[in-house]
A protein has these predicted regions:
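Extracytoplasmic/periplasmic beta-strand context in beta-sandwich domains
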Residues: 2, 7, 73-75, 104-107
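Thr-Gly-centered strand-to-loop micro-motif
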Residues: 46-47, 77, 161-163
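Secondary-structure transition/capping motifs at alpha-helix termini
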Residues: 1, 66-68, 96-101
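Short acidic/histidine-centered micro-motifs embedded in hydrophobic/aromatic stretches
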Residues: 6-10, 59-63, 108-109
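Mid-domain, small-residue-enriched loop/turn segments at the edges of structured enzyme/sensor domains
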Residues: 16-21, 52-89, 105
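A penicillin-recognizing enzyme superfamily signal
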Residues: 34, 38, 83-88, 93-170
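Conserved catalytic neighborhood of penicillin-recognizing serine enzymes
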Residues: 2-56, 100, 114-142
Length: 170
């Protein structure tokens, strides 16, 4: 279990890139799970730099992001223009134990006589280890239980999520 520097503000890219947490909150050194719960920008930019932004781009593609992702430090903060469908693919892949399926609108068509006229052909692919997908999902459940989405859970079913902020009105 490692800890990440979630102090705010922090400077990256030889001092050229200033990153702050929302409200400039200073969280100190915390686990990655807690950084996710608190939506710590500084910890995630640090993580992205340490693992390499190109690996983040590659993983995004495996999880279902087809949009062009520019490999810069702010990418880990959600600055790329991805579609809601792509984000749904990412979260569906994690919830599906790391197995990716291309999205589809119609799973089956049955005629009046009951004959199956069409059935979707899934192209399932394990893109993330099942244990890793489970661990990530557990961390995202923590966002709803203990973090920035606290109070938005469901009493009768597990809920996972991730919050974020924007400076743009979209």
């Amino acid at each position: 279990d490692s800890t990440w520097d979630a102090t705010s503000p922090r400077y990256f890219n030889d001092g050229k890139y200033k990153v702050q947490n929302y409200g400039n909150h200073n969280y100190g050194h915390i686990s990655l799970a807690r950084a996710t719960e608190l939506s710590s920008n500084t910890a995630y930019v640090d993580l992205g730099e340490k693992i390499g932004i190109s690996k983040v781009v590659d993983m995004g593609a495996k999880l279902g992001i087809d949009s062009t992702l520019n490999p810069n430090p702010s990418l880990v903060l959600g600055t790329a223009g991805v579609t809601p469908m792509e984000m749904a693919e990412v979260y569906a892949t994690l919830a599906n134990g790391g197995v990716h399926n291309d999205p589809y609108g119609i799973s089956e068509i049955v005629g009046r006589t009951g004959k199956q006229l069409y059935k979707v052909q899934l192209n399932s692919k394990q893109v993330v280890d099942k244990k890793v997908a489970s661990a990530v999902t557990e961390v995202l459940e923590g966002v709803v239980e203990n973090g920035t989405a606290k109070g938005y859970g469901c009493k009768y079913q597990p809920v996972a999520g991730k919050t974020g902020t924007t400076s743009d009105v979209k």
